[in-house]
Structure formats: structure tokens, C-alpha cells
A protein has these predicted regions:
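Catalytic domains of carbohydrate-active enzymes, especially glycoside hydrolases
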Residues: 45-72, 128-136
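Substrate-binding surface in catalytic domains of secreted glycosidases
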Residues: 158-226
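Conserved, mostly hydrophobic/aromatic
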Residues: 62, 141, 193
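Boundary/entry segment of secreted carbohydrate-active catalytic domains
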Residues: 23-54, 65, 80-82, 91-93, ...
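Short, acidic/polar
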Residues: 43-54, 113-130, 177-183
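Alpha-helical scaffolding within the catalytic cores
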Residues: 43-51, 75-87, 176-185, 218-221
């Protein structure tokens, strides 16, 4: 893979997919982990298309960035990514859509206007994909959520699931969330979650050694989640 192409497909060594069993205790998970990839690009130029065409067959699935939400005060602002559906519908593996949501300073709850707005955005992504004959395997929510807001985030996830059913809704999660009582409720509200095990520790200084993914720390986090 060329240097440019290498930047386009991010291996899921940085994110491990773990299915949550809703409403029941699940047994300890085991076995090999599937290799999947993210396409986290706002601009779909030819190198992005070529990377997918040439390398998607190496993965069990792709998740493509479809929209990003930032906040101006308490008002959400959306940037949509114009996907090339002709490439995605011909991909040799299942394709999921990702909705990225930046940190939210406001409270997170079930009945506020932001929840309704975000659920409508989520539904519109699935509808647009379906109109281009792409049936997404899931909608993945990547929300920079404060640990104090995990219960409110659960209300968002429940709203998203109602809007996009029967498409599954998964979330990304941090290892630090695993210790929070609210996380169990959040995970049970989703159809699955991706444990983000990259950059678990912030560098102590600007010139300190930096590791994108520590395999030993990642394995410990996965064992805790499993």
C-alpha cells in the first residue's frame, strides 16, 4: 500500500468490536478477533477510492465516516461526508456508517432538542445510503462523551435505535468507561460496541515517546471488556 493509501484505511487494532448482549449476562468472549477497517476521510478523492478497491477484501468489514457533529454553544453543527456509493456498493465486505459527535458541553438527555436533531441526522444517513442501494450493516456512533454523561448518552442511543431500526446501532467506548456503573446500561442499550484501545495514555511531555497502540495494554483492556 502506498503512503497515501496507508493513511486511508485504519486497521482495527485501534478498535476492537465487542457485541453486547442486551438484557442478559453474556459469557466470557474468546477466539480470534476480526480484522476490520475505518475510512475516516471527509474528502473522497481518487486515492481513497483506490484504497478501498484494492484493500477492502483484506478486511471483515469497513466503517466509513458519514457525518461529523460539532457544537456552537449548545447548537449542533453538521458536516456531511459525500460518500461514493458506487465504490461502497461494490465493496467485497459489509459496510457500516459512522456518525462522529464531538464533545458536548450541554446536558445530555432524552427529551431535549439536540436528541431529536441527532436522531434525525442518524436516520437521514441510513435513508440516504438505502436510496443508493447500500444496506449498512450498522450505524456506529463515535461520541466524545464525558464519563459523567454516560446515562444521558444511553438516552441518545435509544433514540437512534428507534429511528434507524432495523439497522443495528453500535457505539465506540473507552477502557476507562468499563469501570463506570452507567456504562453497563449504555452498552445494553446498544447493539454492540467498539473498544478504542489506541493511545490509552496521554504523553507526559511534548517530547515524550509516544505509542499509537500498546499491544499489551490493548490486550488487558480487551480482557476486561470480554
Amino acid at each position: 500500500m502506498c503512503a497515501r493509501g496507508a493513511a486511508l484505511l485504519a486497521l482495527c487494532a485501534a478498535g476492537i468490536f465487542l457485541s453486547s448482549t442486551r438484557g442478559s449476562e453474556s459469557p466470557h468472549a474468546g477466539g480470534p478477533l476480526a480484522h476490520e477497517a475505518y475510512v475516516w476521510q471527509r474528502v473522497w478523492n481518487q486515492p481513497v477510492r483506490d484504497a478501498i478497491k484494492q484493500h477492502a477484501s483484506q478486511f471483515a468489514g469497513l466503517t466509513v465516516l458519514n457525518a461529523e457533529v460539532s457544537w456552537k454553544g449548545e447548537q449542533p453543527q453538521v458536516i456531511r461526508v459525500p460518500l461514493d456509493y458506487s465504490v461502497l456498493t461494490n465493496a467485497p465486505c459489509p459496510v457500516g456508517l459512522a456518525l462522529r459527535i464531538g464533545p458536548c458541553a450541554a446536558s445530555v438527555s432524552a427529551n431535549d432538542t439536540a436528541t431529536v436533531f441527532l436522531a434525525d441526522v442518524a436516520a437521514s444517513l441510513v435513508t440516504e445510503a438505502s436510496s443508493h442501494r447500500l444496506v449498512p450493516r450498522e450505524l456506529q456512533i463515535d461520541f466524545d462523551c464525558a464519563e459523567s454523561k454516560l446515562d444521558g448518552y444511553r438516552a441518545w442511543v435509544e433514540a437512534f435505535r428507534r429511528k434507524v431500526a432495523p439497522v443495528p446501532v453500535s457505539i465506540t467506548a473507552l477502557p476507562s468507561w468499563l469501570e463506570q456503573p452507567a456504562f453497563k446500561r449504555l452498552a445494553e442499550a446498544a447493539d454492540g460496541y467498539v473498544l478504542q484501545v489506541h493511545s490509552l495514555q496521554r504523553p507526559r511531555a511534548y517530547d515524550a515517546p509516544f505509542t499509537l497502540c500498546d499491544p499489551a495494554a490493548a490486550r488487558r483492556a480487551v480482557e476486561r471488556a470480554a
